[in-house]
Curated annotation (Swiss-Prot):
This is Aspartic proteinase yapsin-3. Residues 63-394 form the Peptidase A1 domain. The active site is at 81, 288. Cleaves proteins C-terminally to mono- and paired-basic residues. Required for cell wall integrity. It is found in: Cell membrane. It holds the Pfam family Asp. GO terms for cellular component: extracellular region; fungal-type cell wall; plasma membrane; side of membrane. Its EC number is 3.4.23.-. It comes from the Eukaryota. It comes from Saccharomyces cerevisiae (strain ATCC 204508 / S288c). A lipid is attached at residue 483 (GPI-anchor amidated asparagine).
């Protein structure tokens, strides 16, 4: 989920078991999570206008943790999001609750029932996201715990009005905080940063470095983990490579990167018989756990579609092609400048209710930033280094046994700079064919990165109906928001129903 920059497509819930903890001797915080499939959320209601819908339902997911807030404590489930930086929770008395959506599923915070809540009336809160959801309220403080981890003193907002059924625990860079780059900060001409969750962990002594590693695990598995302040070497194979974040908003006065944008240096396709380089045009790409699917500039998607003999369907709004067989080993190769992350084509393929397949990589028009969501991220082990404005990546390794955790002190242990570390994106350009990304791949032993052997069974979508959203989205006036989500929203209908966001294409 990214503030105004990225459309979020979320459906299933990844919940955190009760054994996430701080390890005093190792100084890191481990938050395991489990996956809850979309079918567990119940049936969707019928659209008010009766139109049928084509729904991509199987891959939607988000990560959540349960927090205990106040005295006595009230339990709330919030989205864990790398694409934003603030913690906010739904407040009691939200006008959307009841008649429009069920607010009790993930909990609401009633500040009047907490004897320890302290409001900060001088710090209003407003956040708007690319999917049309928003939250409005004010900051405050209270007793706050995640399992045995005491977070009291961490500032959070209570949203008196929101069209989202759940709150958000943003763990992005502090420059994404609404107090720094949000609507209120801009209008009041007073911007400041505060210790959000990652910074709070560091400054409270729970971790040594403001960094965390993300392991989504294979889609067929029901668990994964996030380590704050550490790396688990058992969760990846080959070399862990480091690349710098790129500052897309330097011209707007930002001295440092605002979000987790990196340089995608090329895109390719690997089959049993050959390697195909699609483009070596440099593209800025956001690594965002709050976005389920992957979004690429329209020219790049067209090149990929052409290599698959896919044709664009105006009816569906997607590229359509013959469904690959269950034993198809084709993978999409993402080049980051001297190393690749490979992802099975099946992760970007969805089967329709009528038996055809579509390419579930969403094209974006104009000068658009690529968004590498969960369909990409589950194939990578990703370390977000907020202190050094860097990302470290390696091919994810599944089915590992014993953990091999190493604390991050100042830099990511065992990671080395990518061969093209300094060859970063600088200007928007249309993706064109040419080049060869397969001659530059390196690993610690000098061989090509191994393509993961994963199931390529195509995900199947459900033909279902859903309620029509009746709310107009509010827009945040962020300085960082040069890329709107309008191109995404013109391709997909993003509809908010109780606790669910559905990606859908309308049939006439």
């Amino acid at each position: 989920m990214k503030l105004q920059l990225a459309a979020v497509a979320t459906l299933a819930v990844l919940t955190s078991p009760a054994f996430g903890r701080v390890l005093p001797d190792g100084k890191y915080v481990k938050i395991p999570f489990t996956k809850k499939k979309n079918g567990d959320n119940g049936e969707l209601s019928k659209r008010s206008n009766g139109h049928e819908k084509f729904v991509l339902a199987n891959e939607q997911s988000f990560y959540s943790v349960e927090l205990a807030i106040g005295t006595p404590s009230q339990n709330l489930t919030v989205l864990l999001d790398t694409g934003s930086a603030d913690l906010w929770v739904p407040g009691k008395g939200n006008p959307y609750c009841g008649s429009v959506m069920d607010c009790d599923q993930y909990g609401v915070f009633d500040k009047t029932k907490s004897s320890t809540f302290k409001a900060n009336k001088s710090s209003p809160f407003y956040a708007a996201y690319g999917d049309g959801t928003y939250a409005e309220g004010a900051f405050g403080q209270d007793k706050l715990k995640y399992n045995e981890l005491d977070l009291s003193g961490l500032s959070f907002a209570v949203a008196n009005e929101s069209n989202s059924t759940f709150g958000v625990l943003g763990i992005g860079l502090s420059t994404l905080e609404v107090t720094y780059s949000g609507k209120v900060a801009i209008m009041d001409k007073r911007s400041y940063e505060y210790d959000n969750f990652p910074l709070f962990l560091k400054h409270s002594g729970a971790i040594d470095a403001t960094a965390y590693s993300l392991f989504l695990n294979d889609e067929s598995q029901s668990s994964g983990s996030i380590l704050f302040g550490a790396v688990d070497h058992s969760k990846y194979e080959g070399q862990l490579y480091t690349i710098p974040l790129v500052n897309l908003y330097k011209s707007q006065g930002y001295q440092h990167p605002v979000a987790f944008d990196v340089t995608l240096q090329g895109l390719g396709l690997q089959t049993d018989k050959r390697n195909i380089t699609l483009t070596t045009t440099k593209l800025p790409a956001l690594l965002d756990s709050g976005t389920t699917l992957t979004y690429l500039p329209s020219q790049a998607v067209a090149l990929l579609a052409k290599s698959l003999n896919a044709s664009y369907s105006k009816t569906l709004g997607y590229y359509e092609y013959t469904c690959p067989s269950s034993d198809n080993k084709t993978s999409v190769a993402f080049d980051f400048g001297g190393f690749r992350i490979n992802a099975p084509l099946s992760d970007f393929t969805m089967q329709t209710s009528v038996g055809t397949c579509v390419l579930a990589i969403i094209p974006q028009a104009g000068n658009a930033t690529a968004i590498l969501g969960d369909s990409f991220l589950r194939n990578a082990y990703v370390v977000y280094d907020l202190d050094n404005y860097e990302i470290s990546l390696a091919q994810a390794k599944y089915g590992t046994g014993k953990e091999n955790v190493e604390v991050i002190k100042s830099t990511v242990p065992s990671a080395i700079r990518a061969p093209s570390y300094n060859n970063t994106w600088s200007n928007y350009a249309s993706a064109t064919s040419g080049g060869n990304i397969f001659t530059t791949v390196r690993t610690f032993n000098g061989t090509s990165t191994a393509t993961t052997t994963r199931s390529t069974t195509t995900k199947k979508t459900n033909s279902t109906t859903t309620a029509k959203s009746t709310h107009k989205s509010k827009r945040a006036l962020q300085r960082a928001a040069t890329n709107s989500a309008s191109s995404i929203r013109s391709t997909l209908g993003l509809l908010l129903v109780p606790s669910l966001l559905i990606l859908s294409v309308f049939f006439s």
